[in-house]
Amino acid sequence: MENDQFLQKQHFLILGLAKSGYAAASILHEKGIYVAVNDQKPFEENEPAQKLSEKGIEVVCGEHPVSLFDQHQITILIKNPGIPYENIMVQEAEKRGIPVWTEIELAYYLTSAKFIGITGSNGKTTTTTLIYEMLKADSQKALIAGNIGTVASEVAYHADGDEWIVTELSSFQLMGTHAFRPEISLILNVFDAHLDYHHTRENYEKAKQKVYLHQTASDKAIVNQDDETVVRLAEAGKAEIVPFSVSKTLEQGAYVKDSMIMFNGEAILPLEEVVLPGAHNLENILAAIAVVKTAGASNEAVKKVLTSFTGVKHRLQYVTTVNGRKFYNDSKATNILATSKALSAFDKPVILLAGGLDRGNGFDDLKPYMKHVKAVLTFGQTAPKLEKLGNELGIQHVKRVDNVEQAVSAAFALSNEGDVILLSPACASWDQFKTFEERGDMFIDAVHMLK
């Protein structure tokens, strides 16, 4: 009630009309709250802007006029997470002392439902999905939202107070939170990522830390004891810490002992019964268990999911086998750590398809994981760097192609029966695609064309 009264007094400006901006504007308008919209794309080419205009919302397209702040007496700016803080409208808001939100903050204000906030440099989507499936298997009321594809404000707006909103959170989204308080929060891991956006490692860490910062002593922070950065970031919060560890035997929390997955000293199931592929997924599994056991889930619910859940699309997803060659779609691998984990999952010869947006980093950190790689097909802005890497390692076949489709056919031509053909780009997709999903779907389509 208090949150709703706060919202009713505000004048909002929505900056950027992707899914989250459109949803935020629509919800605020429906609630009778003052809202205006600004988007770079020209109005005549902008279907979401046209739809909002038809609802009676003021929409300004094609430019970013700072006069909108005075014209509409704006008190809060909600920006698309991907819009950089260097944007003129964001800079103007900060100059005026106007709070800059992402729609995650709005989602928090729209509901009395309980949030589970999941962030990390890698593994977010798999872990978020595991948590959601485990809560459902336990017959708890759960919704899934955030960076996983479902707009959080939309989910929150329609949520009941007794539901869990299992929310995948990017650093971009968390930067625009100021009061957002999950009852259960999780940072899976932290390493250098998105430094083109955050500029420094410190800024990136501060964004991730926001998932812990506003929690109270009655909340729970799920903490990866194997990641020194996560342990340090959790210390700034007030929540009770629930640990998990892949490498240590713990007195409480989630861990592995004698090939058995444990929680608080109680055996849940043998590791060999888990069907999710890839050693790297153990971190995601233990984190998910720590979350759902904290939320009161039964061991039976956890077991039911772990003995049936085989993974998420675009995350080391098995596609098919063609003439003895196994194809895997790991398009979600938008950084080096994700690709190194994918490569670690195979002990058979691998043909690696990689490349994408150039964020200025090198790829030397991949070298220790390339021992099974027999060929590299590169594409996108980073193709020259990955080509250089392959040549330095003395990989027999290193070839630059124009796109994912060409990479698939070239990889198949170079392959033998028993080989793994792996799309794991180690780069974001935005140089050639709108999303990593689009890139993964193109890979899947190209693979099926081989049959």
Swiss-Prot record:
What SUPFAM superfamilies does UniProt report for this protein, alphabetically? MurCD N-terminal domain, MurD-like peptide ligases, catalytic domain, MurD-like peptide ligases, peptide-binding domain
What GO CC annotations are associated with the protein? cytoplasm
Query: What GO molecular function terms would the record report?
Result: ATP binding; UDP-N-acetylmuramoylalanine-D-glutamate ligase activity
**Which EC number(s) does the record attach to this protein?**
6.3.2.9
Please provide an example of a Pfam family that matches this protein in its UniProt record: MurD-like_N
Grouped into one coarse class, the protein's main location is cytoplasm
Which top class of enzyme applies to this chain? ligase
Q: Which UniProt keywords apply?
A: ATP-binding, Cell cycle, Cell division, Cell shape, Cell wall biogenesis/degradation, Cytoplasm, Ligase, Nucleotide-binding, Peptidoglycan synthesis
Residues reported in the UniProt entry to bind ATP:
120-126
Query: What reactions does this protein catalyze?
Result: UDP-N-acetyl-alpha-D-muramoyl-L-alanine + D-glutamate + ATP = UDP-N-acetyl-alpha-D-muramoyl-L-alanyl-D-glutamate + ADP + phosphate + H(+)
Functional pathway: Cell wall biogenesis; peptidoglycan biosynthesis
Q: Does the keyword Acetylation apply?
A: no
Top-level taxonomic group: Bacteria
GO BP, sorted A to Z: cell division; cell wall organization; peptidoglycan biosynthetic process; regulation of cell shape
Q: Per the record's keyword annotation, is Cell wall biogenesis/degradation included, yes or no?
A: yes
Q: So what family is this one in?
A: Belongs to the MurCDEF family.
Record-linked HAMAP family: MurD
Q: What does this protein do?
A: Cell wall formation. Catalyzes the addition of glutamate to the nucleotide precursor UDP-N-acetylmuramoyl-L-alanine (UMA).
| Name of the protein in its database record | UDP-N-acetylmuramoylalanine--D-glutamate ligase
